Regions:
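Intrinsically disordered, low-complexity terminal tails and inter-domain linkers enriched
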Residues: 60-94
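Long, charged alpha-helical interface segments
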Residues: 160, 165-239
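Short Gly/Thr/Asp-enriched flexible loops that form oxyanion-binding sites at enzyme active sites
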Residues: 134-144
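N-terminal beta-strand-loop-alpha-helix module at the start
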Residues: 1-62
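Short, acidic/small-residue loops that bind anionic groups at enzyme active sites
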Residues: 145-161
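Short phosphate-binding loop-to-helix
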Residues: 96-118
């Protein structure tokens, strides 16, 4: 497998956008019910991963057809397409990895691990929020997992971007309009500074048990958030 630059993961939560921006060398992973979004948006995923408990018909049948139309490659646990049976499937040929329903990793985390093994260090997750609350929380924790393992992760929906920073800074262009919320994650965050926003912070402490950094506002200046010691969950919501 060639080393990828970005991994685009399409999950099974709420998707309120009509287009997902892709680059030619992106690794695109459909997670369980996220395969339905791929079909609707006419995206061909490189791999489909999941136990498929959230994938409804007719898409569940399509995945089964994809599995039936493939033979396992020697030494691999997943399945791939052969030239003889490529036309047997009604959908584009992708790799299918069916997971056990009882497992430690969520389907999304399995997709993250797949992307990291492929060499990706930048992850963009769509339809990763909404739906079941526990999966939204798990996906927010996944952002911290990525950061602590040398990668960057972003959750996107129609009106927001969510990411995590650790002992570093993040900036937003001066044309940004909307709301910026900042939360301590995984423990207290020390030395938090926010500039270029309506409410300024300088070398502050954000406690993991109190939402002090919610609903700041962009004011037409370049905005920067930094933390000296700890991790911050950053949520930018635009208008």
């Amino acid at each position: 497998m060639e080393k990828c630059q970005r991994c685009i993961i399409i999950c099974a939560g709420d998707l309120e956008i009509s287009q997902i921006p892709l680059k030619e060398d992106d690794l695109v992973v459909a997670v369980d019910g996220g395969y339905m979004y791929c079909r609707v948006l006419e995206i061909t995923p490189d791999v489909i991963i999941g136990d498929f408990d959230s994938l409804e018909e007719p898409y569940a049948s399509e995945v089964r057809e994809l599995e039936a139309a493939r033979v396992a490659e020697p030494g691999e646990s997943d399945v791939s397409c052969t030239s003889e049976n490529r036309e047997a499937a009604e959908v584009e040929c992708s790799r299918v990895i069916r997971l056990e329903r009882e497992k430690d990793d969520t389907d999304t985390m399995a997709a993250i691990r797949y992307g990291m093994q492929a060499g990706c260090r930048e992850f963009h997750l769509y339809a990763a929020m909404g739906g079941r609350l526990e999966h939204t929380i798990a996906n927010l924790q996944t952002l911290l997992f990525l950061k602590k393992n040398g990668a960057k992760g972003y959750l996107w929906d129609a009106f927001s971007m969510t990411t995590v920073i650790c002992n570093e800074s993040i900036s937003f262009r001066e044309s940004m309009e909307g709301i910026l919320s900042v939360f301590a994650m995984g423990g207290d965050a020390k030395g938090v500074t926010e500039t270029g926003l309506k409410y300024q912070l300088q070398d502050a402490l954000l406690e993991n048990s109190f939402p002090k950094g919610i609903s700041n506002e962009f004011i037409g200046e370049e905005a920067t958030v930094s933390v000296k010691d700890g991790s911050l969950l950053i949520l930018a919501r635009w208008e």
